[in-house]
Amino acid sequence: MKKALFILNILATCLLLTGCNNFEKLLKSNDYDVKYQAAMQYYNENSFSKAIQLFENLTLHYRGREHAEEIAWYYAQALYQEKDYYMAGYQFKRFARQFPYSERVEEAAFLSAYCKYMDSPAYTLDQSLTKEAVEEFETFAEKWPRSTHMPEVNRYLDEMRVKLMKKDYEIAYGYYYIEEYHAAYESLKNFLNLYPEAPMREDAMFYLLVSGYKYAINSREEKKRERLQQVVGDFDRVIGSLKNDKYVAEAQDIYNKTRAELAKMEK
């Protein structure tokens, strides 16, 4: 067996040294043992692009056989080294599903989440990938709470939660900016419930009050009283938290106008 492996290694090395034409022949070859040895050698020599092509070629042939775990692992690792985080994350997640009892499963789960973290865009862009990364890291923390990766996991989670908070505020304020006051009101209310310690909390409270007032004042008559009363309640809840003098003055003005409108409706 050792002699056979030695011969395979020699053959793989010869193929590596004879250039591109022989690499194409290697890809088309049906000698999967030589392909496997060559893939590992390419990986160990940091020729990740060629290793990826060979591992991809080998995956189906070795499914359920000897070397299947090694191929799946190093395929994902080669993609990771090439910074193809989307495909690497997919392969690490697949590895964790296919080899749940492997000693590498914890690392695979971590790297699956980490790849999504690396692909997570700026908060101004769509945050679907960020949410997926958060979910995977939270699942990882539940399953391996004593992992050596936990300091990193907590740091990445904090960073991504800030990003999601900024995105949620941007969306809520965006509704206010385009004068969709009902949507702005609901979004800002949800934001304040979700992020009680947000640094932009004062801004959110102020725009909530303004949105609620503008939505109420433009409502149909049968709904106006109820919505104006809601504005009064919102004022009472937020006024003590407003520190910005401009916000306080405008909030007081909204309150006075709301009270005046309600008094007029009583007549």
Regions found by a protein language model. Name each.
Residues A4, G19-K267:
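Acidic, polar-rich low-complexity tracts and alpha-helical solenoid repeat scaffolds
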Residues M1-C20:
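Sec-dependent bacterial lipoprotein signal peptides
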